[in-house]
Amino acid sequence: MDLADIPQQQRLMAGLALVVATVIFLKLLLSFRSGGGKKRLPPTIPGAPVVGGLVKFMRGPIPMIREQYAALGSVFTVPIITRRITFLIGPEVSAHFFKGNEAEMSQQEVYRFNVPTFGPGVVFDVDYSVRQEQFRFFTEALRANKLRSYVDQMVAEAEEYFSKWGESGTVDLKYELEHLIILTASRCLLGREVREKLFDDVSALFHDLDNGIQPISVLFPYLPIPAHKRRDKARARLAEIFATIIKSRKASGQSEEDMLQCFIDSKYKNGRPTTEGEVTGLLIAALFAGQHTSSITSTWTGAYMLRFKQYFAEAVEEQKDVMKRHGDKIDHDILAEMDVLYRCIKEALRLHPPLIMLLRQSHSDFTVTTKEGKEYDIPKGHIVATSPSFANRLPHIYKNPDSYDPDRFGPGREEDKAAGAFSYISFGGGRHGCLGEPFAYLQIKAIWTHLLRNFEFELVSPFPENDWNAMVVGIKGEVMVNYKRRKLVVDN
């Protein structure tokens, strides 16, 4: 038979099969060669060398991690097409992940898909030295003196928002808290001008930005799909809005108590002030870092306290004790006294960290030792991952790890500290711990302090589940509650 007699489609399929076979052969050959010598490589998940890991990963990262942790242990490698992702699960093996410097363990390569959202010239679009200076701007904007002024705004927003509720009723707690969180973030982060005059417009633009981060965006952030086009249009419009606000503030000489003002006033070490584009990008990054975590965690905290009513009752009693000392006043220092509420929030975050995976790019070989004493060499070039969602439920660290038990963080137990550093990683840790952690706790505390003092609640919908389909794991469906207004009575 002549080659010309073979249908074109069959020739294409045969050629494709040959290419795939060649790739597989080369991958196997390279794997065999790299496995030689004295390197103790982590076990690789079984399956097809090129696409097996991808298939398992796409079925769900957490089920995959659970399955491979049981089969292979706390260190294993997942081949995904041309990349190799090595998972380090648990504090015994993840220390270098969190403590390694940027030359060894880099964020930039694995998080560059955020560049179209945050914009040029900020965070993952700049080299490490510039990024560190920009993180210094965040740190200065979140110092204790700044947080004190933010708390006043958080409390004012909560009081205004819940004053619109009736004497009793039924609401979707998830929707209500999501809406309040974005209002509060607009006031504290984006500024008075946005909160008072442009909230609806800016909120819609941030919605388009948020929806512009799809699973496909991680691999192809510039793919011309409708979600990306809406993202780019929204990003351009936000740049125009904030440029106008920045120019107005500078022209009038006015200064506000918000993160926007902090970024406007920030300067690099060489004396250069921030540009309008940099300020906009840093604000977007700040809102993305905090909005989802606060709204999701505030809802989970409420759902758990209403499901396990003893913790709701303990939180109410704590409010009574605080009110005996301070009356109705709520400020930064008073919120810091609320240990019961803090533990309720922290436990909700342990069970439901919004980010299911943290990633780094390895730029040098390193070695890890498991709790069983096995040593593995992690090669340069691997993507290295750990999972807060899975690591926060390890049974050798947390007793009854799937149970909601805020007292596990109380005096005498402190399970997260007993197991050592990086046992609780809802906010990351080490060199790249979340800068907004104090802000998040204050925001959630301020909201629930107002609710505990002014309302009774009953959870009337089924207990919620995780929404695994979202890039940031949220809550599936509605969280319906009955509420009844009441004023907390304090016995003197």
Swiss-Prot record:
Tell whether Methyltransferase is among the UniProt keywords: yes
- Topology in the membrane? Single-pass membrane protein
Report any one BP term from Gene Ontology: methylation
Transmembrane regions = 12-32
For this record, the Gene Ontology CC terms, alphabetical, are: membrane
**Pfam families in the record, alphabetically?**
p450
Q: What is its main location?
A: membrane
Reaction catalysis annotation: a 14alpha-methyl steroid + 3 reduced [NADPH--hemoprotein reductase] + 3 O2 = a Delta(14) steroid + formate + 3 oxidized [NADPH--hemoprotein reductase] + 4 H2O + 4 H(+)
Q: List localization entries.
A: Membrane
Protein's name according to its UniProt entry = Obtusifoliol 14-alpha demethylase
Query: Which species does the entry assign this protein to?
Result: Sorghum bicolor (Sorghum)
